[in-house]
Amino acid sequence: GIKLPILILTAGTEMYPEVIEYSLEPGMPNVASLQKFSEVLKSQGISKYPVHVKFDTGMHRLGFMENELPALKDFLNAHPEVEAKSFYTHLAGADSPEHDEFTLGQLSLFDRLTNDVLSAIPYKPMRHAFNSAGIERFAEKYPQYQYDMARLGIGIYGISYVDDKNMKPSAFYRCPIVQIKTLGPNDGTVGYGRHGKLGPDGKTIATIPVGYADGINRHLSRGAASFEVNGHLCPTIGNVCMDMCMIDITGIDAKVGDTVTIFGDNPTANDLAAILDTIPYEIYTSVPARVKRVVTGI
């Protein structure tokens, strides 16, 4: 099992008893959260429970702003139930060069705000600010902002903000071919809405057991995306169905049971994101729980 501490970035107040039960460490974005968590701790006779205090340096989603620091300092000094294990912030645009000045402003503000709080409490929490983009684009040039830790998020999956060649994918979405049909030019069409055209020479079609209920966006239909089969990229044909979709494997040596890569090293999650005008985060998080996860190589 996992032996290292687990930071819960956003734990709802109703989850606090479970957080304590499983020795998790919650993020604290405001005094109200600290007060509620402190009450739960006090009712259980617990002191110095580790929490992680979030600072809002420009994302404006969660966290303490500068005008709230006096209340934060007072709380940390007055409530022995909690002990700040770390201070952290989140960068809003570290992936985009156009926002580099803003990102550096966030880091500078975080430095100043946390130094203010550090000077007012009798212990020294760790600090962390870099996300995956921050690590890749700022860590080497601005080592002073590496602090004590960094939060590697989507980088764990091998996604790069500079060049995909810098990273090796660690997450693959794969499935088997479940049926193959060789269709002639007079065999009609493929899929719902009859959008899959066979052309004058016909096509060889492979059906795979994933559809839009499995995170395969319908905008990847009708050849918009291609999936890898035995080293070849095979375009979708017709509309993506709920639980299945079809790909064109004409001229490719393939059989039922062969593996199809939806995303991984080719195509990458970035490739699919570009087709859908979105980000790779959405590609990964769109894969629902019903899709089996297999962990290997540990």
Place the predicted regions along the sequence by residue.
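Active-site-proximal beta-alpha core segment in soluble small-molecule metabolic enzymes
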Residues: 1-126, 142
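Active-site anion/phosphate-binding pocket segments in diverse small-molecule metabolic enzymes
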Residues: 12-14, 18, 30-35, 104-298
